[in-house]
Amino acid sequence: MKILAIRLKNLASLAGEQEIDFTREPLSSAGLFAITGPTGAGKSTVLDALCLALFGSTPRLESTSASSKVPDGRNELSSNDERNLLRRGCASGYAEVDFVGIDGHRYRARWETRRSRDKADGALQKSQQSLQDLETQQMLAANKKSEFREQLEQKLGLNFAQFTRAVLLAQSEFSAFLKASDNDRGALLEKLTDTGLYSQLSKAAYQRASQADEQRKQLEQRLEGSLPLAEQARAGLEAALESHAQARLQEQQALQRLEGQQQWFTEEQRLLQSCEHAQGQLAEARQAWDALATERETLQWLERLAPVRGLIERLKQLEQELRHSEQQQRQRTEQQAAGTERLQGLQARLQEARERQAQADNHLRQAQAPLREAFQLESEARRLERTLAERQELHRQSNQRHAQQSDAARQLDMEQQRHVAEQAQLQAALRDSQALAALGDAWVTHQGQLATFVQRRQRALESQAQLPELEKSLAHAGEPLERLQAQWTALHGSEPDDLAARLVELRRQTDSLERQQALHKEWQQVLDQRAGLARRLGELDQRMVEQEQALLDLKRQGSQCAEEVKAAEQALQVTRELLQRQRLARSASVEQLRAGLVDGEACPVCGSQEHPYHHSEQLLAALGEHDDQEQVRAEQSLERLRQTLVGLREGYSSQRERLNQSRQEQQELTGQLAALDRQLDQWTLPEELRLLQPSAQLEWLAQRLDDLAGQRQQCQRDFDRLIARQRQTQQLQQELRAAETILQQRQQALTEQRQRYEHLQQQVEEDSQQLRPLLSDEHWQRWQADPLRTFQALGESIEQRRQQQARLQQIEQRLQELKQRCDESSWQLKQSDEQRNEARQAEERAQAELAELNGRLGAHLGQHACAQDWQLSLEHAAQAAQSAVETLQAPLDSLREEQLRLAEALEHLQQQRQRQQDEFQRLQADWQAWRERQDNLDDSRLDALLGLSEEQATQWREQLQRLQEEITRQQTLEAERQAQLLQHRRQRPETDREALEDNLRQQRERLAASEQAYLETYSQLQADNQRREQSQALLAELERARAEFRRWGRLNELIGSSSGDKFRRIAQGYNLDLLVQHSNVQLRQLARRYRLQRGGSELGLLVVDTEMGDELRSVYSLSGGETFLISLALALGLASMASSKLRIESLFIDEGFGSLDPESLQLAMDALDNLQAQGRKVAVISHVQEMHERIPVQVRVQREGNGMSSLKVVG
């Protein structure tokens, strides 16, 4: 994996578009480069952009909390939202990275975000990520972030956590890792390798073992309180239950007999009320029939009027049709006269339009020859105008070329003069620095040697200056040790064994209080359950009373509904018989007799001279339909009553089932209450608790639990105080060991510093002997006074002389080019002047020709603007005349057709009116004849009968029919209920009503007592059954719990701990072995002198110094440079672990250089040189000036004011 380019826009302090291209010089050939800049300028933002483009997040954002918010306009963003990196006041931003994937292809990953409407004050939109294959230009992912993450990790070969460990090397974490304790080192290694799973497994094993142990103990306690009855006691309970069941059955049967006798009196009262109700309904029906006498007479007249009602309606319709046809005939006559007048006017206007059309056609034919000549003249004028425009353009271009060439000649002359002056200045400066000519020619060879000499002398001076500080530090190192020893003596004035014994005693007291709390809570739970059961039993008794009353109500309603069903069946039978008689009255033979009746003559059957049904076929049909509907209504009423009876029976069964369920629930609750009482009897409760009422018992237990909780808290506080003292002792021991270690380290550091100074001083003397032949006397004196500044001044002077030589060579070459270009410019200026004169003369000739042709064309066209306008005006006149003729011809033809249609319609209306008049006269004669036969029908009654609607008449007929049927039905019902009452009184019981009520009350009491005895015995048996089932189930469950506890206990012994450190130390030991192996591979390439190995403690580390006889050194004895070197090797080892088999060719180091002394810095630079020698591109982010001077290729982050920065690549 290799990074090729990083691009970004408007991220943090880096404003605008910025780019770092590792494929272009000087970065392409530089294995080591630095990202430099002042603090806060934006160096780390480059790494943020790298992570953003690849993963949409950064390590800095991942370490923040999502709960904290950052304001963004009217909204808020979480602190770990990657969009916080967008620069304030910018509408959009992006981060883009080109890289080489594990398959060798080049890819481009991009992250971008923008604000709504691309405005700086718009709301932030969701960020977007895309991945593109640069080899095939194919977009691999562009919309879904999950798809992008999957594709990127597949192509890159690393996820986010692996990338931050393998590519972004934060070696300062390993500096802390080296000198941490075992626990801290395990936690750091867990964080660095992302293997927190092992701590979680250790905690989970401990928790599961504790849970399994707790469950096992609870089951053992439950089993102790679930012992069943002996076999002899159980047999006695079963015999008692059978006896109570027989007694309860006998009492129930006796109660049913008494309830049957009570039901007779209830039924007698109901039948009396039913008879009175039927007599009242019959009287009301007869009154309603008498009140409708007027309606019955009106219906008889309607039957007599029915045969001529159609004749009357037809006469009225013919009167309206005659009036309407007369009005239509008059309108058609007027329309025909108006149409004739319009027809004559249109014919005159059409003749005039045809004459104007002939004149316009004649004018168009005469103008054809002049039009052709005018078109030819216009075509020639357009050609001359194009020629004139082309010559004007040529004239303008020649003027422009002449002006440009003149300006170019003047600029070349001025440039030539400037270069001649600069040439003279450079030649003078080179003569002044001629003394550096020889050293400058070999500067590349001697620069590294001079830099090494400067560094060694500087390190020697710094080493000499550090010696007094180290001596002083050694003198002060003993003071903390003496102070800590005095604290130890003061702290352990009492016996340590006494502290341990007190801790054990407090733990024992705490355990005892916890057991008492658990026991009291169990008592409280059982008493609370018992109070709840008693409350539920009271509510259940009340509900059972309500259910028994509801059962009696349903039984009474069912009996009443059954009687109504029986009455409805009898009424239906009576209705069917009446309807059968009415149908016989309308049978076929009766219809034949009725058809032979004659108005005014006697009926052969009854002798009446009035025959109301003779002409009332419609009335007979309506009566037949009404009979059918009446039978259907009676059947539907019977069906509804039957359904109601079924519903009442089902409700009775359901209510009885609910009562049985309540009785069963009562038995179960009674059994549970008895079981709780037995459980309380088995416990040894305090005497004062047993003497209290149930409600007071719960209050006593609550107070006792509060007291126990206070005692336990006091024990816990004492225990915590002793634990704190114990921890203080352990802390003091650690501080004593650390003070002793610091004293030893300072002694060793002073010895090593003295040896280092002597070695450096010897190297400085050797460097002086090699350097003297290279410098002149003046430079040698400066060198001895200030080597660093002299070296810098020499480098700047030699670099300046080299640049002056290169610039002088460029100027001489440029002067030759300028001389040649000046000669060419003079010749071109002369040529352009000649071309300009020729273009001006051609333009003047074209203007003269065009003016002469425009004069001829104007005389020919006259008042017309052009030939096209002249032709169009003639054609428009001809077309307008033709359109006028066509416009008049169409309405003339239409008007003629309309006149013909009006004549036909007028003739049809006259014929229709004659037919209507004939029919009206015939019907009028029939109506007069019918009126003469009706003696008692005057005009007022006739108008009233004709004004009566058919709906009203039908309503009266139906009302009369219903009243007649209701009278019949009520008569039948009253007779039936009298018969039912008589039959019921024949079955009167011997006991009177008052004595029967007393017998019922006494029987119910006996039944309740019998049921109570039965339920108590049944509850005892059920409780014993539950105990038997529970004991068997608990034994099986306890065995499973013990097996589960043994399994988790073994696992807890191996890896379990409450803090998770047990398995973490085991797992991180393996990780540490693997990390040491990978780090030693890196050390062999960076510095073969050192090698890491485990030792000193469980997770301890030692350094093997091969140049000191494989001496084992403590990590506390390493110098700053050695610590950096070991930390870098550990970071590279972790990167190798994270990347597995993937080769990482790009590394970024962001920490750890600011605290290094010059010698350590030199050692670090040597390690970095070895690192880049492995073929990797290494980027170092630091603001240390010494590193900037030693790394020539840099990416500089430059501040530009107003919080903005930019990137610049130098080298």
Curated annotation (Swiss-Prot):
- Annotated region (Disordered) at 62-81, 392-419
A Gene Ontology biological process in which this protein takes part is: double-strand break repair
- rRNA processing as UniProt keyword: no
Q: Which parts of the chain are coiled coil?
A: 115-156, 197-407, 497-584, 628-1048
Return the Basic and acidic residues bias intervals.
71-81, 410-419
Q: Is-annotated flag, keyword Zinc-finger? A: no
> Molecular function (GO) terms listed?
ATP binding; ATP hydrolysis activity; DNA exonuclease activity; endonuclease activity
Which residues are ATP-binding? G37, P38, T39, G40, A41, G42, K43, S44
Q: Which UniProt keywords apply?
A: ATP-binding, Coiled coil, DNA recombination, DNA replication, Endonuclease, Exonuclease, Hydrolase, Nuclease, Nucleotide-binding
Gene3D superfamilies per the UniProt record, alphabetical: P-loop containing nucleotide triphosphate hydrolases
Q: Name one Pfam family in it.
A: AAA_23
Its subunit composition reads:
Heterodimer of SbcC and SbcD.
What is the role of the protein in this entry? SbcCD cleaves DNA hairpin structures. These structures can inhibit DNA replication and are intermediates in certain DNA recombination reactions. The complex acts as a 3'->5' double strand exonuclease that can open hairpins. It also has a 5' single-strand endonuclease activity.
What protein family does this chain belong to?
Belongs to the SMC family. SbcC subfamily.
Output this protein's name.
Nuclease SbcCD subunit C
Taxonomic source organism? Pseudomonas aeruginosa (strain ATCC 15692 / DSM 22644 / CIP 104116 / JCM 14847 / LMG 12228 / 1C / PRS 101 / PAO1)
